[in-house]
Amino acid sequence: MASYTGTPFNKYKLLDDAYRASGIFETGDALIPHPRETAEKYVRRKNMSYFINYVKPIVDAHINLIFKNEPVRQNTSSTYDLFLNDVDGNGTSLTRFMKKATIRAKLHGVEFIVIDAPIIEQGTIVTKQKFIDDRLYPYLYLVSPSNIEDYVVDKFGRLIYIKYSVENDTIDKDGNKRVISEDWTLTNDFCTRSIDGNTERFENTIGVIPMIPVYGTINNSDDLIPQSDMYAIARTNLALFNACSEWREITRSQAFNLLVYPVGEDDDYEDVDSLNIGTSDLLLYKNGHQQPEWICPS
């Protein structure tokens, strides 16, 4: 029989896969097998599954209208324009970055923007040209709520401590890909970064945590990380994904009738263990006086 562990789907993976029609919906692993379903039939049903996406159109309908026109920004400088056109060191404009952040905030309920800057060694002379060439101005990156390990807010709801992890893909000296996990702790006074057991501590010179939560809707809860209003829709999409597959399986089963054949008392009726009830097998029964016929589920 097809195996089923009963492990719940990760909430944020379900949301991401539903939005992109990828992951568990692409492979069919979102289908929950029937208790008596064979592994072969379950694999076949996964290969025949199809996904009707309701999550992405709803999210995009809310977000695309906001970014229909380029925002008007005034009183900018030449150095600030550098940042506007490249906020992450990968040539991403601020508008494009904020649209990505807003989509993920709508999908996850909240998304965190971290503001950081390269470390400049003490005594280094930074000219304007060096500032530009070495990209020594701040950069942004996103942190999903699934990466938040712990946090503390005061009685006013202000974030005063947060711990999170991010993965950073690099190439080692042998040219092989290496995934490094960075564990960050941010407070109003200091920040720490741990990589492979080595921890660095930095003074927080700005006095506030350089992380901004972006919410997909007004957060009326007391939680820094609220429940996503898209989660119920993603769960409904999951249920419909399973229902469509099950209904298609019933339709296919009814499309091919099952031959039932009566067997007399003197007929050989010993080797029947190899026969399985299904549309592709023969169903034998004893003491029947009717003629062979085809039946199908009603």
Question: Which residue ranges define each predicted feature?
Answer:
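N-terminal start-of-domain structural block
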Residues: M1-L31, C191-S228, L240
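Generic low-complexity segments that are intrinsically disordered, proline-rich and/or Lys/Arg-biased
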Residues: H34-R36, I58, V72, Y139, ...
